[in-house]
Amino acid sequence: MLFRSPHMSDSASFDEVAELLYMHGRSLPHSILMMIPEAWERALDMESTKRDFYRFHATLMEAWDGPASVSFCDGLRVGAVLDRNGLRPARYWVTKDRRVIFSSEVGVLDIDPSQVAYKGRLQPGRMFLVDLEQGEIVDDGALKESLSRQAPYGEWIRAEQSDLDDLPTTTMLVPEHESILQIGRAHV
């Protein structure tokens, strides 16, 4: 089913899908991580609950692989995520007076270097999130751990998902030519 307006740009389509997910009850970080997950399929050291979170959501929608650096805001949180390939620049500075500057380039604002508490670069598959209500930067790992424990994703996968190799084999019935013609005539 198509959930986006025709003749829209990729960015506009992304916005519409993110809004759809958010308006139907998911938090904005949850919605964005559904759309731009980190590279989880071959990450053997990933915690199982986080892997289950990504695996479950992969059954609902295909990842939007970039190259993309996407910023978002819901009025309470502002953040950015870099796709799993990491081909877009995404840098941030945090000042001693708790301002956050996020941009694709360094030097977009004239900031005295002595006022910079720390600098960073958003890494592939990682989310940079500022909680405006709490006045803090949310750790990527803590955010994803919290989201991955909101529902029993692993149980749902084990209970409901089947691999094609596990399905029973059947013989293919080939109808006779005349019966196909009769069925076709009945539906005309």
Residues covered by each model-derived region:
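Conserved short alpha-helical segments that host acidic/polar catalytic motifs at enzyme active sites
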Residues: F3-R185
